[in-house]
Swiss-Prot record:
Organism: Saccharomyces cerevisiae (strain YJM789) (Baker's yeast)
Source organism superkingdom: Eukaryota
GO biological process: maturation of SSU-rRNA from tricistronic rRNA transcript (SSU-rRNA, 5.8S rRNA, LSU-rRNA)
Complex formation: Interacts with the 35S, 23S and 20S pre-rRNAs and with the U3 snoRNA.
Keyword Transcription regulation: no
Record's protein name: Ribosome biogenesis protein SLX9
Cellular compartments per GO CC: 90S preribosome; nucleolus; preribosome, small subunit precursor
Stated family: Belongs to the SLX9 family.
Function recorded in the entry: Involved in ribosome biogenesis. Required for normal pre-rRNA processing in internal transcribed spacer 1 (ITS1). May be involved in the movements of the replication forks.
Polar residues bias locations: 10-21
Annotated spans, Disordered: 1-33
Annotated localization: Nucleus, Nucleolus
Length: 210
């Protein structure tokens, strides 16, 4: 009995493949061909995403950049303060504030100018030959503040003293009560009040304006 060949089909298939593809066919009928596959960004199962920390950092950077842009647009000083310590920035700002404050030398020069102006006004008033038709608006009047604060007191008026005892204190209330009783007794014994009480009261109220 003759044994059958089991590799006849394989040998036929390999021979057929070698005829079709030539010498590039490897053993076992597998082709060795190189293919250029383009890289697909969605080839991976899990796409790369920004983490929460990265998102927070990006937001902070954008916020700071916007603030810097606004500060440089609002005033050009902010652009010069980049890379400078906070203490030096404070010193520079303090120096700018000191420059804006008024100086004594400027005050002295203004006072000298005021004196010169007063002399010019006096000379001009003398040169006008005592003409009374000059408008008051064209003159500069120097008024003392003490004179403005003092009120004119009409003659014959009774001035009320402001340094009276305090009614909120027990001692002051007693003093005021004693003064009032003495005054009441004095008014009752007054002849003018006995003749015409309302007229006397009216006259006293008129006098008590200050």
């Amino acid at each position: 009995m003759v044994a059958k060949k089991r590799n006849t089909l394989r040998s036929k298939a390999s021979a057929r493949n070698s005829q079709n593809f030539g010498p590039d066919v490897a053993n076992n009928g597998i082709l060795d061909e190189s293919y250029d596959i383009e890289s697909d960004p969605r080839a991976f199962l899990h796409q790369p995403k920004e983490t929460k920390k990265e998102k927070l950092l990006n937001r902070q950077n954008t916020f700071l950049s916007n603030l810097k842009g606004k500060s440089t647009l609002s005033d050009g000083i902010g652009a010069n303060f980049d890379g400078i310590s906070k203490s030096s920035i404070r010193r520079r700002k303090r120096k700018l504030r000191e420059e804006l404050k008024p100086r004594m030398q400027d005050l002295l020069t203004s006072l000298e100018q005021e004196k010169d102006l007063r002399g010019i006004i006096e000379n001009s008033s003398k040169d006008m030959n005592n003409d009374d038709d000059i408008d008051m608006d064209s003159k500069i009047r120097f008024v003392d503040t003490k004179e403005m604060n003092l009120k004119k007191i009409e003659p014959g008026s009774v001035r009320i003293k402001k340094n009276q005892p305090n009614i909120r204190n027990q001692k002051g209330a007693k003093a005021l009560a004693a003064n009032e009783t003495a005054r009441f007794n004095q008014v009752l014994t007054n002849q003018d009040f006995q003749k015409n009480p309302f007229g006397a009261l009216r006259e006293v109220i008129k006098l008590q304006k200050h």
